[in-house]
Structures are given as structure tokens and as C-alpha cells.
Amino acid sequence: MKLFFRTAFLFAILFALSVCTAQDSYRVIFLGDTHYDAEDVNLHPEGISKAYPRDIEMWKERLPKLLTAANQKAAESNTAFVLQAGDMVEGGSGTAAAHKNMLEDGYKKLQSYFSVPVLTTCGNHDISTKIRKGEPYPAQIYEKFLQQNVLPALNKTEGIKVLSAFNNNHSSAKTNIAFRYGKDLYLLMNFNSYGPDLDKLKEVLEQNADARYKIILSHAGPLPWDRSWRPEWRLYGYVKMEKEKRDAALELFQKYNCIFLTGHYHGVSYLEYATEKGTIHQLMNSCVWTPDITENFAFKTTTPDNYGSRILATKIISREAAQELVNTFKPGIKKYYNGNGAGYMTLDLNDQNITVNYYHRDENTPSATFTITTK
């Protein structure tokens, strides 16, 4: 009997050690915008919008090839989950019920390609739909989608501990989710409108200051991408947002050396922003594989000196506002890579660093590699 208990105790210790090791060193698959759409009356009861025929065509062949390749990389390593950075669906459904169908169908379609959980966050297209009088608001539809799909996926994944779900500023819908996986903190963040409730965000980061990495999945990050189209469209960048809150959020992300995984602008980029207040790493990926995405990938720029040139070319905001953005952020830009691409990324996390590989289209060899350290 003593031998039995000793053996059982030994196996329990070995199992605990194996779980710790699995959560100390693991892989995450990172997907950008996927814009799911289909020719389905349940998604478009009033007829299909002709504005974005690319999405329906993309999902017929190109996206399945990309997702299949991403799943192969997931199977090659100790992969914990897939992170999708918002604009999971195209939107524009016409009714609340149709938009709910689109979110659920898009999520099921994505999940069907992977044997590990798919976790997503709210992009602008994910709440882009007409509503009729008496119907729930898009944010409420998305909140229910999270509760019925993403939260169950989190709760049944070994090693994940859900910490909280909280609302955006000026909204009651709980569309932000914080969780721990092993040593790391993850936030699924709703960047729309006024951004997450700043007090609740601060509380989550303070209570998890011991986390090895603080990784935030947000459709857009706090750093403006160097784009001429809507360069001010960023996390907490809403024009009616109080500047004090915007500045406080940026300092908070720097203080905790946050790593942002973003989408939105349909490209491949990496920014490292550092001042005496701390460092922010911001990655952008896109899965929008349109016919103009050529076979061979190369960054158009790889130097911080080029940051801001496209922001200054914008016609969307005033020249003064564009110059203020560049003056605010360019001095802190230490690394800047930017290119026109569509594909998937792998993040391999361990105690030393995070190795990021970008795979172009459906390739199985990386076209670019970054190493992120936060120490």
C-alpha cells in the first residue's frame, strides 16, 4: 500500500511538472483580419453588398489554403491556441439576427481548421451592421457572441484561468476579456470607440504585474501605423476621447511593457516604441489574401527613419494633426518594419524571448522573423 501511494505521488509530481513545462514554453498562432463572408440568405436577408466581393471570393479558395497551412504549424509544436485580431467577419448583414448568424458561422468556420481553441476580439467590422428599432445594439450582439462562443472555449482550455470580463468606456457591454495562461497575461481587447474602461484595465495590469509577458490582442494598437488612410484610428485614438485618458493609457502600456497583436490595416508590420517610461511592441498581421498579394514578400521599409512619411501624406486629418502624431511617436520608434502581405504568424514563447515568424500566404517557411524581449 505504501508503495502504491509513493508511486501515485511520484506520478502526480511528474504530471504537474509536465504541465508547468508545457505552459512555460509554447506556441501561439496569430491571425489578422479574416473578413468571413458567404453567399447565404441567413447572413444577408436583404441581399449581398457589392462593396466587398473580395471577401466571398477569398473564402472560396485562398483563405482555406492559408488556414490549413497555419494549422500545420500549430500541429508541429506545443500550440496553446489561435489568436485572431478582429474583423473576423465582414459585417453589413442588415439585421441583428443576420449579424449574429455571421459571427457564429464565421467563428465555427475558423475553428473548423484548428484542433486548438480559436480566440478572437472585436474589430470594427464585427459590430458593423444596420439595426432596426427594438433590436439589440451591435456591441450587445458581440457581447452575447463572446459569452456563447469565446468564453466557453477559454473555460475548457487546460491552463487558462479567466480573470475578468469588462466594458468599454461609455458602454455596458462586456467585450474585453482578461485571462492567464501559465506565466503570461492575455487581454482580448475591444478597441472600438472610446476603448476599454481605463480604471478596469489598470486594475487588471496592476494585479498581474508578475506576468512574464502582457499580450494584448486588439484590432488596432495604441501606436499609429504609418498609413495615409485614417492614421488616427488607433486604440484610444477616437477623436472625442479625452487626451488625458489617451496619454494615461499609453503610459500604462509602457509601464507594463505590453505586446500588442493587431490587424485592421491589411499589412504586415512591426513597431518597437521605447522611452524612459517603458516599451511597447506592436505587431500587425493580415489574412486578407487578395489577388494583388504577390507570391514573394519583402518589407518596403526596415528602418525607423522612414516612420511617419505616409502619415504626413494623409488627406483624412489635417496636416497639423498628422504632424502632431509623427512628432509624438517618431522619437520613440526604435524598430520599424512594414510591408504589403497576407499570411499568418507563429509566436514561440519561453523565458528568454518571443520568436515571431511571419509566413506569407500559405507558405511553410517564414518570410520574416522577429525576436521580442521585455527584460
Q: Where on the chain are the PLM-derived regions?
A:
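Extended active-site neighborhood of metal-dependent phosphoesterases/phosphodiesterases
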Residues: 47-53, 93-210, 237-240, 244, ...
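Active-site-proximal segments of metal-dependent phosphoesterases and phosphodiesterases across multiple
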Residues: 23, 43, 47-60, 198, ...
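Bacterial N-terminal signal peptides
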Residues: 7-18
